[in-house]
Amino acid sequence: AQPTDQQMDARSFLSEEMIAEFKAAFDMFDTDGGGDISTKELGTVMRMLGQTPTKEELDAIIEEVDEDGSGTIDFEEFLVMMVRQMKEDAQGKSEEELAECFRIFDKNADGYIDSEELGEILRSSGESITDEEIEELMKDGDKNNDGKIDFDEFLKMMEGVQ
């Protein structure tokens, strides 16, 4: 079978080491060497790989991945699913982390980052950056042109960075 676009995307998202690690975990549960594992074992394999799906998430994942209802998942389907979980985890985490960053950067706690605060942040991270560059970043980030960056604008700026 030809790999689907999703499967190719999943492989390109992962490093060779990660694929090998996932394969090793997958193979432990592929007891008959048939190249697939039971959906019942999926949660165990995911937890071995550091994921923590809830029962509901797991059911939703199985329903999505086991399209033919065979009760089994092959390795390519497994990769797609792991990548999806990793991306969702990263998104959830990064928003919390960014909210935390925003609070730290917003020195006077007015709910905005101004160009002075932005300059401090960038310089403290070891960037050698000119005032012109800071103004440029402010202009790019400040979508409503009020001279300061609110949390939504900050999130959009950071999306561009990641």
Curated annotation (Swiss-Prot):
User: So where does Ca(2+) 1 get bound?
Assistant: D30, D32, D36, E41
What Pfam families does its record include?
A: EF-hand_7
Which residues bind Ca(2+) 3 per the record?
A: D106, N108, D110, Y112, E117
Q: What is this protein called?
A: Troponin C, skeletal muscle
**Upper taxonomic lineage:** Eukaryota, Metazoa, Chordata, Craniata, Vertebrata
* Superkingdom field: Eukaryota
Query: Domain EF-hand spans what residues?
Result: 17-52, 53-88, 93-128, 129-162
Q: Which family, according to UniProt?
A: Belongs to the troponin C family.
Role summary: Troponin is the central regulatory protein of striated muscle contraction. Tn consists of three components: Tn-I which is the inhibitor of actomyosin ATPase, Tn-T which contains the binding site for tropomyosin and Tn-C. The binding of calcium to Tn-C abolishes the inhibitory action of Tn on actin filaments.
Q: Which organism is it from?
A: Pelophylax lessonae (Pool frog)
